[in-house]
Each structure stands twice: as C-alpha cells, then as structure tokens.
Amino acid sequence: MKGIIAGAVLGLGLISQSHAEVLIDVRNDTSEDCSLAVNARIDKTKWITQGWYVFASGEEAPIILKDINDIHNVYIYSDCKKNVTSPKTETKKAWVKSNYKFKDETPRDKEQGYEEVVFERLLSDKYQIQN
C-alpha cells in the first residue's frame, strides 16, 4: 500500500514538472510604449523565442511563459533599450520577427521579416524597462 501511495505522489510530481511556468513581472518606466521579446530554454537542447509583449508607458503587468522550467535560462529584449547594455550583463543574440507576434521553436537566422537582436539575461522575476 505504501508503495502505491509513493508511486502516486511521484507521478503527480512528474506531471506538475512537465507543466512548468515562469512568471515575470514587467514595469515600463519610460515615456513611450515598449515591446518585449523573450528567448528561453525549454529543455537541454531547445530554445524558444517569442514576442511581442507590448507595455504602455507606466504599465505594470506579468508575462507568463509556459513550458519554461528555469527563470535563470530566460533572456529579454526590449525595443526601447536598443544597444543599451551594461558591460557586466550576459547577452545572447537571437532572431525576432520584425512586425508581428511570433513564437519560434526553431532558429530563424537571416529569414525574411526577421532581424537579429541582443537579448539580456534576466536576473530576477522582475524586469523594469528604463531609458
């Protein structure tokens, strides 16, 4: 009987891990509307890039990333912070769709309608857009 209960508890633990989510609280402290794109590891070999999340000036709202297990493997790009990166910040290049909402699980290197941008590693579950 104890074996059945232990197996059921272990099974529930595995099911809950497969439906992991990361919640990021975002606040736009700029005077303009800003868009965010996210690049995150979904398993040991795959990355997902998705966007655009639009935040009006002064807006604060969460982003929920489904199927992401670890917030330490999340990178963010903001179109309001182009080329403004601290030398100490870890960065990663990836391709984003220029004008439309997207969710890509395969790299889109040099495809028409995509541009390469520099993502910054997310350091906590809060992200503040500043000029």
Name every feature range the model reports, one short phrase each.
Residues S18-D29, D33-I68, Y75-N131:
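Intrinsically disordered, low-complexity segments enriched in small/polar residues
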